[in-house]
């Protein structure tokens, strides 16, 4: 399956006639834990918190990772998804309904918005290619930020829900 403990990332690429509108629908770390987010090929830069290093530094340190990279850092999106992933793996069945319901809603909204963003890009590109590219950059960043905030909030909610369920269980034994 596409959602196993060995899955690091999943993506679906939707090619477009206009290369900048080619969209990589990316689920990190796994599609059962995170929504597929639209990452347009035409973006000018990666969303804040999603790039740890520049390309040269990343290549140089790929097989010799600095130990500080393994410490939690709230300024990096990776850690929000990693925290959610760990909570989900601890009790997948307990978390599944909430997480999958949220993912379905987010993906439906992004899927519905895509044709509108594409059309806005096309119209804007006729008069200002730079602004059109910025539109894609801003939209991609906004969706990435929403998902990051959702992952953080959902991880906390799941912990609270699990604690409440445990307390209810033990109270029922009194």
Whereabouts are the PLM-identified features?
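C-terminus-biased signal that marks the final domain/tail of proteins
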Residues: 1-174
């Amino acid at each position: 399956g596409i959602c196993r403990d060995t899955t690091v990332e999943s993506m679906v690429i939707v090619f477009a006639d206009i290369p900048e509108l080619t969209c990589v629908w990316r689920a990190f770390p796994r599609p059962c834990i995170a929504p597929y987010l639209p990452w347009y090929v035409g973006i000018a830069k990666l969303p804040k918190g999603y790039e740890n290093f520049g390309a040269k530094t990343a290549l140089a340190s790929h097989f010799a990772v600095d130990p500080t990279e393994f410490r939690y850092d709230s300024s990096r999106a990776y850690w929000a998804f990693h925290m959610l992933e760990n909570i989900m793996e601890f009790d997948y069945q307990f978390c599944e309904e909430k997480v999958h319901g949220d993912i379905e809603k987010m993906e439906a909204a992004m899927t519905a918005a895509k044709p509108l963003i594409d059309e806005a890009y096309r119209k804007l590109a006729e008069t200002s290619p730079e602004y059109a590219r910025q539109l894609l950059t801003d939209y991609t960043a906004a969706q990435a930020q929403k998902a990051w905030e959702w992952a953080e909030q959902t991880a906390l909610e799941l912990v609270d829900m699990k604690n409440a369920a445990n307390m209810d269980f033990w109270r029922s034994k009194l």
